[in-house]
Amino acid sequence: MGNCCGNPSSATNQSKQGKPKNKNNPFYSNEYATTDRSGAGFKLSVLKDPTGHDISLQYDLGREVGRGEFGITYLCTDKETGEKYACKSISKKKLRTAVDIEDVRREVEIMKHMPKHPNVVSLKDSFEDDDAVHIVMELCEGGELFDRIVARGHYTERAAAAVMKTIVEVVQICHKQGVMHRDLKPENFLFANKKETSALKAIDFGLSVFFKPGEQFNEIVGSPYYMAPEVLRRNYGPEIDVWSAGVILYILLCGVPPFWAETEQGVAQAIIRSVIDFKRDPWPRVSDSAKDLVRKMLEPDPKKRLTAAQVLEHTWILNAKKAPNVSLGETVKARLKQFSVMNKLKKRALRVIAEHLSVEEAAGIKEAFEMMDVNKRGKINLEELKYGLQKAGQQIADTDLQILMEATDVDGDGTLNYSEFVAVSVHLKKMANDEHLHKAFNFFDQNQSGYIEIDELREALNDELDNTSSEEVIAAIMQDVDTDKDGRISYEEFVAMMKAGTDWRKASRQYSRERFNSLSLKLMRDGSLQLEGET
């Protein structure tokens, strides 16, 4: 459910402005009033067994340290002990579908269920009032995994082995507890503090689920680069976490993802083909043992893929302290930096898009549903959807509409209820035009010159960067995005950056789910999802 921990740069910026005022609960306002579909107020209950109702009795909320699709994370202080924690406050107004509500509920249940572990962020308390859910957890202020690697002067295979051992130990403890993570990626690992010996911690269980041995899942979730082929085939189990860890290992060793393309469909097809490139620099210098582990973690057949326990027994991990201590080269560090930096800029832009759409998406959806639901059954069929969209001036091909209907019809009854219709509406709004990208661009282009200049970039990313490397990072972004080298970023260059590699549409998790469901159906129909040897 987004970054639960602090960005250390925020603390630096705040200290310049004086001591922040504590706020008991930022969600007590009309802006967050919750209404049902008829417009009347009602109390939505999200958590099964919260610690309490009023967080302000036990904690003081301080400055904002992070922001995600659904919530804002604050530094918070235990009034009794003075201990510092992170508090993720999720507005109920943002939880528009049953899926959103279930995600939050399950995230808290999983965090409660997980045993204390040095590499897993721990839950302290949870609160629920009429307007929001508040999740109080361990505070991590040591920064992101890739940022620390880049900051170190010497990056080696031995360092990568130590990181991978930690990540796979997290996977192992999750699987032992009957939890499938489903969203392992570098951004979901933070260091507890700035010390060199700081523990690396898994921070986000927003897409995680409980599973039983042999149980298979079909919901497409996660981030495109890290998705296992069986996720796209919509038939998977906990083996997907080992695949995702294998993708991270590949990136740790060479600085780029193993399966990359300009479009989401291209990424999906590269994942299905599962061809691993060991020719580019620095792979010729990487040990055979490391390459062997990468191959076995990125085995396309989940039955043949190593388990987390088997990864930890692999010679490269067992002998992590003896792994080559020779630098992997400046190229790998530069790639990792670029990967991390571009994620920061995209995250900032996605946040602008998400904040804009959060208001826009809700407008008119209820009225549109009621207009299409002519029989007042509380659900609409394909013909009603098609007729309603045509009436609204949306011309969608029958085949695309059928795919969209199948992707969003969660209960499989051939109709869409209101919750499912919300997902369709969000999907269609984002497909219709690039208005949201224009709005994000305009957010950065503060003087409305038609270009993002270096000062505007610096201002927009102020909260994302620490003072020690900010100028270097800004220069790196400009170098990558400014393709015509005129010292500024045009709208066309901005759009190209947003659409490359990761899908900008992930501004909405619900949309991302439906988008990849739709893509999966297309790939099934054209035969792309068949395993080798299948007919």
Swiss-Prot record:
Its EC number is 2.7.11.1. Ca(2+) 1 binds at D373, N375, K379, E384. It catalyses: L-seryl-[protein] + ATP = O-phospho-L-seryl-[protein] + ADP + H(+); L-threonyl-[protein] + ATP = O-phospho-L-threonyl-[protein] + ADP + H(+). Residues 323-353 are annotated as: Autoinhibitory domain. A lipid is attached at G2 (N-myristoyl glycine). Activated by calcium. Autophosphorylation may play an important role in the regulation of the kinase activity. GO terms for molecular function: ATP binding; calcium ion binding; protein serine kinase activity; protein serine/threonine kinase activity. Residues 59-317 form the Protein kinase domain. Transmembrane segments: none annotated. It is a lipid-anchor. Keywords: ATP-binding, Calcium, Cell membrane, Kinase, Lipoprotein, Membrane, Metal-binding, Myristate, Nucleotide-binding, Phosphoprotein, Repeat, Serine/threonine-protein kinase, Transferase. One of its GO terms (cellular component) is plasma membrane. It comes from the Eukaryota. The active site is at D183. It is found in: Cell membrane. The modification Phosphoserine is found at S223, S490. Gene3D superfamilies: EF-hand, Phosphorylase Kinase, domain 1, Transferase(Phosphotransferase) domain 1. Ca(2+) 4 binds at D482, D484, D486, R488, E493. May play a role in signal transduction pathways that involve calcium as a second messenger. There are 3 contiguous domains conserved in the CDPK subfamily: a kinase domain, an autoinhibitory (junction) domain and a calmodulin-like domain. The autoinhibitory domain (323-353) inactivates kinase activity under calcium-free conditions. This is Calcium-dependent protein kinase 7. It comes from Arabidopsis thaliana. The gene is CPK7.
